[in-house]
Design a protein with these regions (language model features):
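Short beta-strand/turn micro-motifs at beta-sheet edges
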Residues: 56-59, 114-119, 328-330
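Charge-rich, well-structured scaffold segments of protease-associated domains
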Residues: 1-43, 63-69, 74-79, 91, ...
């Protein structure tokens, strides 16, 4: 476990849990120094170009089926301001209604769909602009439109409302912390790794982000975001243009090459080696399909009725009137988010007209 990362989440006796971990797990091992440092990739002297291929069927066309991607490395994930600032820029440039970079590429007829991507879960985050269903011949125009549009934004300034909307959007997601069906503790743990993996002293910089959001709000209209675009997108040589081109029959060709490789390997084995390989394969299959022993299943902890609290959450209703309209106020912890539901009396609507009420949404 010398190279492991352990974290606890929830309301608990932390000292007791850490003591248990030490006595039942960590103390049973000797410490070993593991050189697991993730090295910084040196910047390129000039942006590079990569071409890769994906398979399409013989009935599909290669026309308008290429993916174009403009990619730049943006600092490191240990910079909490950059970590969120480019989330905001991704929204403002490529996702918001009327996003200028997406609109410029769409108006130029490059690709059938434009999207942005910001991978900030790695040591050196990557900001990408992607055109789906484009042509290889559009590569130069793709790069030119992106850089001309970004230069214009740097010279004339970002749309303040788009930046504010991007900040609000990301702050709302942060405060609400709605991870769908995934456990909140698990998702926090994964986000902690965005920084903890690269610096043992900075595990919480991305989950304690309210100060960073306040900083980003204060930078709107100051030239801060325009400078980020200039520094990390326009003048940054650490980037790549990636083309993913369609190729008919690629899957069949690769399957054939694999079969030939496996056949050559098989022929290189002795009869005894082949027999041993079959026996190992059969043993693995038998192990995987064997039912678990009852004593092993009983080791899995389960909840009993006594473990489940019988107390229910209190209902907090405070009735008020605002402008002679009845209001029911619930004072509960929402992490700074206000939720408002407005209800209308529909008793005056004829039953036959009720299906049409949804049109008003």
């Amino acid at each position: 476990p010398s190279n492991s990362y352990l974290y606890l989440y929830g309301d608990m006796d932390m000292e007791a849990k850490l003591t248990w971990l030490d006595e039942h797990y960590l103390s049973r091992f000797d410490y070993a120094w593991i050189d697991s440092e993730i090295k910084m990739q040196k910047p390129f002297e000039h942006p590079v170009e990569w071409k890769r291929y994906y398979s399409i069927s013989n009935t599909e066309t290669e026309e308008m089926n290429t993916y174009l991607s403009y990619n730049k490395v943006v600092g490191t994930s240990l910079d909490e301001k950059l970590y969120l600032a480019f989330e905001v820029l991704d929204y403002a440039l490529l996702s918001a209604p009327g996003a200028p970079l997406k609109r410029a590429l769409t108006d130029a007829g490059i690709g059938k769909d434009i999207m942005g991507s910001y991978d900030n879960g790695i040591y050196q985050p990557i900001f990408s602009v992607i055109a789906k269903n484009a042509n290889v011949e559009q590569k130069e125009a793709f790069v030119k439109v992106i850089e001309d549009t970004l230069k214009d934004i740097v010279e004339n300034g970002m749309d303040k409302k788009a930046l504010e909307a991007g900040i609000n959007y990301n702050e709302f997601r942060y405060r609400e912390a709605d991870f769908g069906g995934y456990p909140k503790g698990l998702m926090y743990g994964l986000q902690i790794m965005d920084s903890w993996l690269y610096d043992d002293e900075k595990p919480f910089i991305h989950i304690e982000a309210l100060d960073t959001f306040e900083f980003l709000k204060a930078q709107v209209g100051t030239g801060y975001y325009e400078e980020l675009i200039r520094k990390y997108l326009l003048e940054n040589t650490h980037g790549a243009i990636v083309l993913i081109k369609p190729e008919k029959g690629r899957t069949a060709r690769m399957d054939k090459e694999l079969q030939e490789k496996l056949q050559a390997y098989k022929e290189s084995l002795t009869e005894e080696e082949r027999k041993e390989l079959v026996e190992r394969s059969n043993a693995l299959e038998a192990y995987q399909s064997a039912p678990d022993a009852v004593e092993d299943l009983e080791k899995i902890p389960v909840l009993s009725r006594e473990d489940i609290s019988k107390e229910i959450e209190p209902i907090i209703n405070e009735e008020k009137r605002i402008a002679d309209v009845p209001v029911v106020y619930h004072e509960i912890e929402t992490n700074g988010i206000g939720y408002v539901d407005v209800l209308f009396d529909m008793s005056g609507v004829e039953e036959a007209d009720l299906p049409y009420v949804g049109i008003l949404q």
